[in-house]
Amino acid sequence: MPHAFKPGDLVFAKMKGYPHWPARIDDIADGAVKPPPNKYPIFFFGTHETAFLGPKDLFPYDKCKDKYGKPNKRKGFNEGLWEIQNNPHASYSAPPPVSSSDSEAPEADLGCGSDVDKDKESRRVMTVTAVTTTATSDRMESDSDSDKSSDHSGLKRKTPVLKVSVSKRARRASSDLDQASVSPSEEDSESPSESEKTSDQDFTPEKKTAARPPRRGPLGGRKKKKVPSASDSDSKADSDGAKEEPVVTAQPSPSSSSSSSSSSSSDSDVSVKKPPRGRKPAEKPPPKPRGRRPKPERPPSTSSSDSDSDSGEVDRISEWKRRDEERRRELEARRRREQEEELRRLREQEREEKERRKERAERGGSSGEELEDEEPVKKRSRKARGRGTPSSSDSEPEGELGKEGKKLAKKSQLPGSESARKPGQKEKRGRPDEKPRARPVKVERTRKRSEGLSLERKGEKKKEPSVEERLQKLHSEIKFALKVDNPDVRKCLSALEELGTLQVTSQILQKNTDVVATLKKIRRYKANKDVMAKAAEVYTRLKSRVLGPKVEALQKVNKAGAEKERADNEKLEEQPGEQAPRELAEDEPSTDRSAPVNGEATSQKGENMEDRAQEDGQDSEDGPRGGSSEELHDSPRDNSDPAKPGNERQDHERTRLASESANDDNEDS
């Protein structure tokens, strides 16, 4: 359970980045900001800053005195330990206990507030005032001139500790004017060792004067301490004698040196500039000063070491610039070299390819096919070989190629840096593939030949479409060629010629019946007789190829049937009128069947003709029998069961075509 605290309790408060700090639970004043729930208002001794902390970060002072009450190097910590013991009721309105040239009252002095020190300092001030009253007017003029010159030169001067403090106090007493620097004669009289001592001593009070609230404290909370007023600065001048630290120098801020204003204004300026150093210590706990702090701590810049450091920084910057320029030049040179090498390689590759073409042309063979397949072979060879150094056979024309490559590189560099970077990237990618380029020429030739043959085979396979595809293509060409708007007779004739040369089977024709239909229509194309004749020729070719000798047999049967009908008609005319109507009645169904209504009607007509030929016993009986036997031998499907629907359909199709051809022949005759 965390301890419950009351206002006025002394505690050690723990902040992140700070040790356990001596503090006090503070009262909440009327109108003040109320703390969040479960937090107490804390007043830190030494820094006189406030914050809100929870009970888990607070530890009773009496219990933890031995544990956390040890001296620490942190600014204000030791002063806080002294305050919590000797002045536990201190508030942020009281001056801090640290002794420095900017402390506000002599009452808060830590180890230097004795009466003996005050007496000594007062005597010192009295003697100095007596000496310096006579020379104040002269010094004012000389010092003001020196201040102006120092401002123009940009150097902040520092004086010995005792001289500056005495002259400051004398001037404050006489004319209330503060001069930040002493005349050059006094500065030149100093030895470099003394200036180094004073510069070292200037930093000692800054380490000790950590009790100022504007500076770094344990928490950047509410800062109650404000900039001291003019009356406080006057009291400071009188209280400076009560301090035993003789290492107090004139404030080196540029405001005091340039304007030569009063001591109160100079001190207030310094105090205004110092708060940024401890603005938010919670965010930056390290004790190092901020970036703004080094401005007032710069007075030793008059020494040659500071000027050397400034010049050294300038030299470093110039060196960095030079290095950057050198790197850029090196990169540009590398890019140019890479471009030249790339161009050389491309030239060499082109020459090699030209030589190979010549060799191929000399050797003979399918030169046209090789030329067609050259471009893909080029790409593959480039990828496989990489971009290594040129071989021994290609090393002779390097001089000429180098000149050409330089010219091309200059041209390629004009568009911009992007064109220069790309070949560099290609070069880097191609470097690991340098070795494969050393292959013998014969191996590459054989490999390319094999690749060319494989490509030729693939091309042949692709170029050879199926018969069905060609048939469909020719069919579409014929249709387009015989448009009503713009007929193309030549194209139609060429397509019909090619169609007649196709090796068409019955299966293909069954799938593409529309081709046969178009051929039938074109046979009656009255616009051009050549097209009609060609279509009839192609139609008969297709029939002869598909049906074979069966067509001839059917034609013979049809001719025999026609002759028989004629003979019968003659007999009927000769016979008496009674028998004629019977025979005519018998012949009526046959004539009705012979009408080409569908494929079945044509097939039935053909069958009736065959039956009649067999009954008469004429010489033409051998024809249909032979045709049927050949039909059985030619088509494997005829050997299968005739009861199947597929076989019946094929038979009907064939008989239909045969009967139509026979009818056409009869019509022509």
UniProtKB/Swiss-Prot annotation:
Write down the Gene3D superfamilies for this protein, in alphabetical order: 2.30.30.140, Conserved domain common to transcription factors TFIIS, elongin A, CRSP70
Tell where it localizes.
Cytoplasm
- Looking at the record, the residues that make up the PWWP domain are 7-64
Q: Which regions are flagged for Basic and acidic residues bias?
A: 115-124, 138-154, 194-209, 233-246, 313-363, 419-469, 561-584, 622-657
Q: Which residues carry this modification: Phosphoserine?
A: 114, 137, 165, 229, 231, 233, 239, 268, 307, 366-367, 391-393, 395, 450, 454, 620, 628-629, 635, 640, 659, 661, 669
| PROSITE patterns in alphabetical order | PWWP
Note one Pfam family from the annotation. PWWP
A single GO molecular-function term is: chromatin binding
Q: In its keyword annotation, does this UniProt entry include rRNA processing?
A: no
Tell me the tissue specificity: Ubiquitously expressed.
* UniProt record, GO biological process: DNA recombination; DNA repair; DNA repair-dependent chromatin remodeling; muscle cell differentiation; muscle organ development; positive regulation of cell growth; positive regulation of double-strand break repair via homologous recombination; skeletal muscle tissue regeneration
Q: Does the keyword Transport apply?
A: no
Biased region (Basic residues) positions are 155-172
Its GO CC terms? cytoplasm; nucleus
Coiled-coil zones: 550-575
Q: Phenotype when inactivated?
A: Mice show severely impaired post-injury muscle regeneration.
- Keywords, ordered alphabetically: Coiled coil, Cytoplasm, DNA damage, DNA recombination, DNA repair, Isopeptide bond, Myogenesis, Nucleus, Phosphoprotein, Ubl conjugation
Which residue stretches does the UniProt record annotate as biased composition, category Low complexity?
127-137, 252-269
For the region Interaction with DPF3/BAF45C isoform 2, give the residue spans. Answer: 466-548
Annotated cross-link Glycyl lysine isopeptide (Lys-Gly) (interchain with G-Cter in SUMO2) - which positions? K550
Q: Where is this protein primarily located? A: cytoplasm
Q: Where is this region: Disordered?
A: 87-469, 558-669
State the similarity comment: Belongs to the HDGF family.
Q: How does it assemble?
A: Interacts with trimethylated 'Lys-36' of histone H3 (H3K36me3). Interacts with trimethylated 'Lys-79' of histone H3 (H3K79me3), but has higher affinity for H3K36me3. Interacts with IWS1. Interacts with H2AX, POGZ, RBBP8 and CBX1. Interacts with histones H3K9me3, H3K27me3 and H3K36me2. Interacts with DPF3a (isoform 2 of DPF3/BAF45C). Interacts with SMARCA4/BRG1/BAF190A, in a DPF3a-dependent manner. Interacts with SMARCC1/BAF155 and SMARCD1/BAF60A in a DPF3a-dependent manner.
Functional summary from the UniProt entry: Acts as an epigenetic regulator of myogenesis in cooperation with DPF3a (isoform 2 of DPF3/BAF45C). Associates with the BAF complex via its interaction with DPF3a and HDGFL2-DPF3a activate myogenic genes by increasing chromatin accessibility through recruitment of SMARCA4/BRG1/BAF190A (ATPase subunit of the BAF complex) to myogenic gene promoters. Promotes the repair of DNA double-strand breaks (DSBs) through the homologous recombination pathway by facilitating the recruitment of the DNA endonuclease RBBP8 to the DSBs.
- The protein's name in its UniProt record: Hepatoma-derived growth factor-related protein 2
Q: Which gene encodes it?
A: Hdgfl2
